[in-house]
Amino acid sequence: MPNRKLKIYLVAGEPSGDALGARLMRALKKKTDGNVVFSGVGGDLMEKEGLKPLFDISDLAIMGLAEIIPSIPKVLRHIRNTVDDIVRVQPDVVVTIDSWSFASRVQKALRRKKTGIPQVHYVAPQVWAWKKKRARTMYKYVDHLLTLLPQEPKYFTPYHLPTTFVGHPVIESNVTRGDAAAFRKKFDIAPEKRIITVLPGSRHNEVARLLPVFLETARQLKQTDGNFYFVVPTVKTVAKRVKEMVRGSGLEILVAESEEDRHNA
């Protein structure tokens, strides 16, 4: 009888976690020769790797009091549904990825269910920068922590939390090997144009606060030098809002949505 496939439940609530989750899925499929099945929450990149997301993570792209308050019922419902789905699936392990605000609530709620399912979190909360006390209590609902930076384990291991440094995807990826020539050719950008990339974030509140400032800066720069060409790489969670704001500015600015275009930009 063939071995049972490894069941892994992934929870990624933001585009950054979606990218990490997709990389993790590829690595695990390779490591297990495909003898693994995934369930959980994720975005487009994880969906391409075979995940059928429990819900659209655009619902979690919130930041700031004005957006959080009206979204509380929906977020709480997603937390309950995620935990209920984990209990139903009975995976071998649950891996929450980044998005600590959402992930920690899922982990705590699942622990209260006393399922005995191992709980792993991928991407340490930045306790070295703020809210250091979180490191003291994480062991209560996280069984193992995976960190991106080599100095991070020392902040958690003294508090009985097994922690492993696994490397940063930016260093391991081909982020520096984007094809700028192909990007210019695809969008007919003249060689003399100087490309400036505008990065307003992946949360609605970030975009609302930052993009107007960036657009006004772009307007002023265009008035002083016509050789600037502005590109706004964006993700599905905020793409509609970004495009509306760019159109409303009246400026000729390219919004890059595909992974390839974002990479090449």
State where each predicted segment sits.
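Charged active-site motifs of nucleotide-sugar-dependent glycosyltransferases
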Residues: 5-7, 190-197, 226-229
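Active-site and donor-binding regions of nucleotide-sugar-utilizing enzymes
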Residues: 6-186, 199-206, 220, 235-237, ...
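Donor-nucleotide binding loops and adjacent catalytic segments primarily
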Residues: 32-35, 205-265
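A short acidic (Asp/Glu
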Residues: 106-107, 191, 243
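Glycine-centered helix-boundary capping/hinge motifs
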Residues: 160, 188-190, 250
